[in-house]
């Protein structure tokens, strides 16, 4: 609520301020007089404005605790602004004001008096940084709309004049409520006199009033007025011409105003068109984003369909493999059945044979009791006969009983055999039933195969459909790739259009700038017209004054009176006197006439030159018009090309939208097909499971058959045992028969001995027949036994074959199990592949999301760029406003300068009047005529010079005005062409919009038709899916019926529970194992899911680490780039130090021994030979005078003083072993001696050859110069315990052609550094006095290693900025700054410093890039500067254009790389224009 109340109060205050402004403007218009402090509307305005300035202002205070107010805000904003600074300085000059509030009120009153309040406040509000630092967010000055409204209201006060006293009020307490009346008009206490040239109008007014008073006080009786009247007609003609020109200029001003309005309208229309184009670009960008999203979705769906197709193909291959395995298993099963049938047929035959043999045996057994009965009867008869004859022995009875028992045992065995035969028959029946069941199962399998055929056909058809879909997807991908290329082309074209748009905006800005420039020119022209009007008024006044003087002269020259004779006598007496006066007066008159004629000639010459300049300006204007017309034509061509590109873009966008719609429809159809494929895959999986169940049943049947084979083996073993038992019984029977035969023979023999008659023979015959029969039976039994043995052998062979077959079947089963394992592995591989595909899909989704994020970031970046462009445009607008305000301020200053020029002309008139007064004084004082004439001559010469200067200034102003007029004419000529172009562009834009609307309507209609087609296709696909689902349901029913039949078969096989128990147990175990495997698979899946999640987390972490690594890599690369030089330096230092350490360790003992002798010798040489700097002012060899450029150098051997060029030789000292500077004579002496192997001209280091320097070669100069210390302190060579950096620098500097060694710098005066910090201006001409052979800098440029070259121009140096730039100089290298200068007279200044140590500096001049380096001139030789301690300043004046190379040399340092911080400036020469005399 508080915020709303504050806002409502703020709005009310702004409305009150607006009402006060309107009241002030009305009061000024009605009264026609300036507004004073008596006005109540002024009181209201001041209070409201102060409230707004203090509203929501931050509380600030000074160090003393005084509160800061809006006066400090004005100072912070306007302290550096030209024009507004005058008011601030004026308020600060008022000592009466003590508080910040009073100073702010005085500044507001100053701005009202000078009509600058709106401009100053606008400049303050444009400085948003300072405003936000002084005000909170609720302030109206931080709200652009409210601030613009306030400034727009205050701009109405620029036309209102205020008459306010600058002093006399206590502004610290309150605003003044009444107007203070001044007592004297010239009192300076109540006048606004800001301390500046631009605002001092009171001095001009006072001087103008003084000139009028002086003109009115002139004496009209002077004879020089006649001379002044001679130029009156010419002045009148000039006035007429000026009036005509004024009319023309006014008409031109009106035309330019109209053209300016038209241009503003055209610019506004162009801005609207740009906004529409921006909106279209935004819509196109949104469409592109939507297209990219659709393309990403299509890619995802295509990847999903591709994965499904891959899985379908893999499943198809698995099904084919399973079908092949099933077919192979069926073939193996059929072959096994055939083998078993082939094996069963001989077994059946053998069983039939055994049955026949058993029947025969039964028959024999049935006949055997009869035979036994007959034998018993015979035995009874025999016993009767024997009993009659002899009693029968008891042993035969016992044997007979045993035979009976044996017969009973045989009967029992026969019954057992019959039971075995029955069991075998039952088993055969079971086998037959099983064969029937197998045949039924085979028939069902054949049915399933037949049913699978259409399914396979459907699968093949779906595979074809999938292939078609794949082809479509490939085509779609090709289309998408083509569309992506088109999108890329569209983006490129869009970028090109944006660039062209930016170019057009730049051209519009340039046009606006030209318009502003034209407006400023128009303002200047209007100002000039006003100045001409004022001059016209002054000339009219002068004309009136001259006419009055003429009338006075005519009155004085009236009719002669009666005193004529007396006057004639007096005249006759005065004739000689008059003649003498005329002779004395003729000379100045002639001189005055000569001056006037010279002035007329000058004016004529000026007019001719003005006409020529006008013609040249017209020609230039015509050329500019032609250029503008050409530019307009180019702009029209660009606009047409942009419009054509825009139409093509719209067409492409429409085509892309249509293709996207078709892609969406095709994607929907692909999704439906994918659903159908998933359903078919489910059906195939169900069929696969059914096949697995059938295979399990077949395995169970095979196991049952194996059990039956085992039973058969057991039966064969039992048969073998029975055959062996029978064989034993036969043997026992044979033995019994033999015993019986023996008994019979014994009996017969006994009977024969007893002499029995013929009946015994008969009985013997019968017994023999019986024996023969028994033998025959025995033979038959033996044959049967042999046959049974053969059968047993055959059965054993068959059993072996069956076992072999069983082994084969087991091997086949093992193969099948291996195939099943392979299938399982394949299934697992498929699962893993599926999971891998899912992972890849997830990764692709992540990549897509990342791409989307990148695209969003790109969009955000584009939005930021557009916002930055808008901000830049706003800043440019603000800058343009600032420039317009500055132009207005400059306009005001020009007006003030013109007023000054008018006052100067008035002063010239005063001087002319003074001349006339002096002439009258000459007539009155004839004695002083000669002196006064001389004084007049001097004054006339001075005045002539001033007039000539004024005429030159006026000519320059006239030329500038003519150029401005020409530019205005050119701009006016270009306006109608631009208007026509804008009209054509608007018509084209309207036509383009209409065409775009029509194309959009057609595209919408096409899209609706395509949508209807795809909907019908979707309905057909749905119907096909329904039919396929029905077929699948029928197949499921058939499968259910087959399963029911299988269950019935299982029910029939329930009787074989005992045999199948083992198989059921095995199956249960298998199922348990399967359950375990399923559980393990579930656990593995969970593990996989966990691992996937962990992998995703790991991938995210890896990506984060990768990003961090990338950042670290970039940082390391940057650091590596910075540290490469340091590493090279360290490697060099390492190698060099290793070498030097060995050398120094060797030389250490010798140095210890030589140190005392060296000190003693140096002291002797210093005492005996060393000369002070003041003892020699010229070089002792070449007699050149020492100066800053030619410095003093002591020879370290003889101690005399030479210049650098005469003392540029180095020789190894005898005691210290160091290279020291010496003169030519000492160098020749030492070189002739045998003890200086290294005394070469250049003084190369040991083991490092370097080019020798000639004695005349200009080397670097020592930094000591004139101020070298007379008390020379030699380097302390007695201390060699620690190898310091300075010693290493001495070693490395001794082998190079560099400026000086550290011993030299130590020996020089410390004032040398002060002399090096500032270098005087040098030119190429200054180097002509120097010797020619300056080889060290040129050798460095030729053979030295360049690190960095930074070419600069004068314009780049002019825009160098306030800060310094960095230049890197690696060790043993140098860096170069070539400055190309195209004009002479410039002054190039530099300031540089180095880090961490000093650096050498030199300047070399080169005429052009093609000139060889041998022809270059050394302006400043190589100088070692202590730039690491203080800034080195210097400057150079350019007298010949060319290339000035600033060389920063670091070749003397082999280990330390350095950074140079430099700042360059350019000063142009000041052209004297005589403005001091205005």
Swiss-Prot record:
Q: Where is the composition biased (Polar residues)?
A: 1294-1305, 1314-1324
Low complexity composition bias: residue spans? 1231-1261
PROSITE patterns listed in its UniProt record: GOLD, RUN, ZF_FYVE
Q: Where do the GOLD domain residues begin and end?
A: 1337-1466
Q: Which residue stretches belong to region Disordered? A: 586-613, 1231-1277, 1294-1332
Q: Which residues bind Zn(2+) 1?
A: 1179, 1182, 1203, 1206
- The domain of life is Eukaryota
Localization annotation? Cytoplasmic vesicle, Autophagosome; Endosome; Lysosome
Which disease is reported for it? Cataract 18: An opacification of the crystalline lens of the eye becoming evident at birth or in infancy. It frequently results in visual impairment or blindness. Opacities vary in morphology, are often confined to a portion of the lens, and may be static or progressive. In general, the more posteriorly located and dense an opacity, the greater the impact on visual function.
Q: What does this protein do?
A: May mediate microtubule plus end-directed vesicle transport.
**Which PANTHER family does this chain map to?**
FYVE AND COILED-COIL DOMAIN-CONTAINING PROTEIN 1
What is the name of the protein in this document?
A: FYVE and coiled-coil domain-containing protein 1
Say which species the protein is native to: Homo sapiens (Human)
- What gene name is listed for this protein? FYCO1
